[in-house]
């Protein structure tokens, strides 16, 4: 339902703008702290020698803390911005996307389909059925939504939108998997492959899962409310979540993953830049509603 008058609408718009900015600042700040910590201490724990005892104790928990904390923080930022900008309509998308991605992950960790055989480590606990961390389907949602929102501005065709959004989502995994399963061990592959130990089947599984998620968003006409948030904010939110694995890859010297991710995104950015010039990077179609 509409906001309730121009004054209330303007106030909600101002609040949303401040919330969007603050959320990105906090998310980028947390990400920077995590990446620097990994680069300094994660790659060389001997640097902890001679430091206060609490530092070593914190380091022992930091791998789980920063990974889990980043997911919860990103979800909180996105949920807060969506609540102010669009009300609670986004929950109708969150529930099916969470359940679909959970089902896909359960199939992967049980039967090796559609990603290949792998398992999650206890670093990301708690887990559903001792197989899939609770936060993993959340991360699928908060990266699928900006991917769809960006693609929706670049194409008016539902099929093109679904295909492009799935590729934008897939680009994230080109950095995520090397960072989380090769440089570190948040999950471990039983099936292996040439791309930092990841099987090629994983990319296929990611794309197929992405297509299903984007098709659900298209069926729900999510573009009607994601368009209330500016193209620039969606791009920055996506980037804030990409910086974590990309920075970890750089710190670990996995430059192939860095180059591959940036190269794919550079190609995908062409239609997005065109959309940005036409629609205005900071423009949105509304300030609130439910």
Spans of features found by a protein language model:
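Aromatic-rich, lipid-facing transmembrane alpha helices and their immediate juxtamembrane interface loops
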Residues: 2-290
């Amino acid at each position: 339902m509409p906001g309730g008058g121009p004054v209330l609408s303007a106030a909600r718009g101002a609040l949303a703008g401040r919330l969007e900015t603050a959320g990105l600042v906090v998310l980028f700040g947390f990400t920077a702290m995590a990446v620097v910590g990994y680069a300094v201490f994660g790659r060389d724990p001997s640097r902890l020698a001679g430091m206060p005892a609490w530092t070593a104790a914190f380091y022992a928990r930091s791998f789980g803390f920063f990974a889990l904390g980043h997911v919860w923080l990103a979800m909180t930022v996105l949920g807060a911005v969506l609540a102010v900008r669009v009300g609670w309509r986004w929950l109708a998308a969150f529930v099916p996307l969470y359940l679909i991605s959970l089902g896909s992950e359960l199939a992967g960790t049980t039967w090796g389909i559609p990603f290949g055989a792998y398992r999650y480590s206890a670093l990301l606990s708690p887990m559903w059925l001792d197989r899939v961390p609770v936060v993993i389907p959340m991360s699928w949602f908060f990266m699928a939504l900006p991917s769809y929102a960006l693609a929706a501005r670049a194409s008016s065709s539902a099929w093109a939108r679904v295909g492009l959004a799935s590729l934008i989502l897939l680009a994230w995994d080109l950095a995520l998997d090397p960072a989380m399963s090769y440089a570190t061990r948040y999950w471990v592959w039983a099936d292996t492959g040439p791309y930092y130990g990841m099987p090629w089947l994983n990319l296929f599984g990611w794309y197929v899962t992405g297509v299903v998620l984007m098709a659900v968003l298209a069926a729900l006409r999510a573009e009607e409310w994601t368009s209330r948030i500016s193209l620039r904010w969606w791009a920055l939110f996506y980037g804030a979540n990409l910086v974590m694995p990309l920075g970890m890859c750089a710190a670990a010297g996995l430059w192939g993953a860095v180059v591959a991710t940036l190269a794919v995104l550079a190609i995908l950015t062409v239609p997005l830049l065109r959309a940005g010039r036409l629609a205005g990077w900071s423009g949105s179609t509304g300030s609130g509603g439910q």
